[in-house]
């Protein structure tokens, strides 16, 4: 019994240390990420969705990302923009469509991916539009960039440039804690998604990434 208790305590403290280390890392890259790098060039800009309410009103993170992607498109960073983000409820407008409208990017150069509900699904569905060999410019807030990069790499993207829409949305410090948990949660979901490839249909496996 004592051995089991020691094992449980060891696992508990290992988990605590891992979470604290992850949190410190998230804070570090959020506030140290350079915002003034030269703009990259690519085949497509990927605008990753954030929050949207049932009425179709974009949250501050989505607004930041949409406006940044519009600016990048007008600067000639890429010829098309893929807006990626699903619907808050059936029948509601997608985050992707609302962000495309907010960005000012013309319909002819905007691509709407309106199915995704997670960063992993952003990657999976966006790459079905662009292909895995396209040169992609990922746009999101600085705190979210590393997980976005890892998600797109995991889904097969080869050439990725990262551009922050800003460090953090206004009053968004709670997002740092959420991102800490999301990193580990995403890793677990991705492992489960890969492990079930041999015996689950694709639609069910896709739901695992929700």
What are these regions (language model features)?
Residues 1-43, 199-205:
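N-terminal membrane-anchoring alpha-helices
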Residues 172-199:
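A transmembrane-helix-recognition feature enriched in membrane-embedded lipid enzymes
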Residues 208-210:
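Active-site cores that bind ATP or allylic diphosphates and position pyrophosphate for catalysis
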Residues 26-177:
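A structural signal for short, hydrophobic/glycine-enriched beta-strand patches
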């Amino acid at each position: 019994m004592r051995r089991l208790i020691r094992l449980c305590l060891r696992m508990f403290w290992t988990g605590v240390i891992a979470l604290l280390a992850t949190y410190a890392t998230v804070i570090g890259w959020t506030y140290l990420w350079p915002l003034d790098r030269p703009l990259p060039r690519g085949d497509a800009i990927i605008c990753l969705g954030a929050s949207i309410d049932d009425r179709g009103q974009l949250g501050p993170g989505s607004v930041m990302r949409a406006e940044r992607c519009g600016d990048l498109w007008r600067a000639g960073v890429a010829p098309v923009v893929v807006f990626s983000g699903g619907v808050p409820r059936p029948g509601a407008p997608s985050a992707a469509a609302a962000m495309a409208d907010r960005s000012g990017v013309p319909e002819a150069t905007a691509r709407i991916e309106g199915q995704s509900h997670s960063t992993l699904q952003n990657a999976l569905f966006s790459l079905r539009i662009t292909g895995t060999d396209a040169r992609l410019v990922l746009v999101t807030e600085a705190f979210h960039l590393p997980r976005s990069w890892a998600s797109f790499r995991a889904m097969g993207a080869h050439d990725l440039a990262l551009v922050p829409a800003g460090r953090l949305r206004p009053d968004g410090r709670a997002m740092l804690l959420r991102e800490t948990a999301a990193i580990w949660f995403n890793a677990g979901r991705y492992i489960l998604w890969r492990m079930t490839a041999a015996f689950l249909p694709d639609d069910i496996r896709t739901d695992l990434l929700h």
